[in-house]
């Protein structure tokens, strides 16, 4: 682990996924099947990680990740390695309380027969000398991405997942991960559950971790269902107002959120007193590539509510649905925009 390394002021990072090479999976598509098999697939995934690391380093990203190149999906890529979940006989259910999806079924006690991402992290750690971040799905979002036929309680299932995630996270931290992020888009939808057991499940997942821990809560990928949903939310998006006070009292170190080109009142980030704030300064729902000044504008606004030492410019969400050149341009803007404000502060 190199978390003790000196990071610059306004250290940049990304929220999640990056586009996959066209030879690995169909581009600009969620859940795209692999184009390779066996050893060729293993090699292809590692080559893809090398590419996205180079993309991030060229853009000046300070805390890098594997861009989720080894997984087809940020939730199912983990759950498909667990026992007790049937991926063959799917069930159509409403997820995130806004669109229908064919999801796997929980048919027995969930368990993790073997580490899921240890080999991925070993390679990632060996491939860069920068601080690294690794993402895992959060317990509530896992529960919301399947159909339960065994536990009969979303809370009980979430706690079972949290225990599994904690085992995984401890192993990844020991392998040198500097930040482990739990992705919880479901926190922006099920506010009563967040209060009643969602934060508790998140706390269980991060229990005993020595590395930095983060939670990512956003308004989703730039897909049609999310775009339509966001249009229904009115002139101000105040969902964070219900979750941020709870997270401010939690043991989670960092909160990653959506700000760029959104209707989130920027002052809501002030509710995260004492936490690092990963402010989304890149809009992932458009192919327009931001300028450095666009990014700098978001950062300057955020600095009115968060101390500079606690602000980390980031992307709003993952970018796997975007073309690689668009994603590369956006990363470059993120790095340049942070550098611009950094110079203004010294």
Named regions from a protein language model:
Residues 1-346:
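Domain-level signal for soluble alpha/beta catalytic cores
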